[in-house]
Swiss-Prot record:
NCBIfam families: rpmF_bact (TIGR01031). This is Large ribosomal subunit protein bL32. The gene is rpmF. Residues 1-24 are annotated as: Disordered. PANTHER family: 50S RIBOSOMAL PROTEIN L32 (PTHR35534), LARGE RIBOSOMAL SUBUNIT PROTEIN BL32 (PTHR35534:SF1). The keyword Ribosomal protein applies. GO terms for biological process: translation. Belongs to the bacterial ribosomal protein bL32 family. It comes from the Bacteria. Disulfide bonds: none annotated. One of its GO terms (cellular component) is large ribosomal subunit. Keywords: Ribonucleoprotein, Ribosomal protein. GO terms for molecular function: structural constituent of ribosome.
Amino acid sequence: MAVPQNRVTRSRRNMRRSHDALVAGNPNECSNCGELKRPHHVCPSCGHYADREVVAQANEVDLDEDAA
């Protein structure tokens, strides 16, 4: 069976884990709508990237009016 050959000390364990920390995100402000977005990504709220509309936003449909 696979078992550890030697005990891993607290120091060696912590040195191995020293690179596992999470990095906080760095959101930027969208130049079109002002919402926070990820750097180098299309704005999820307005669909703009680099001052052009890349993703057209769908219009919200009121289901009560269309049902009639």
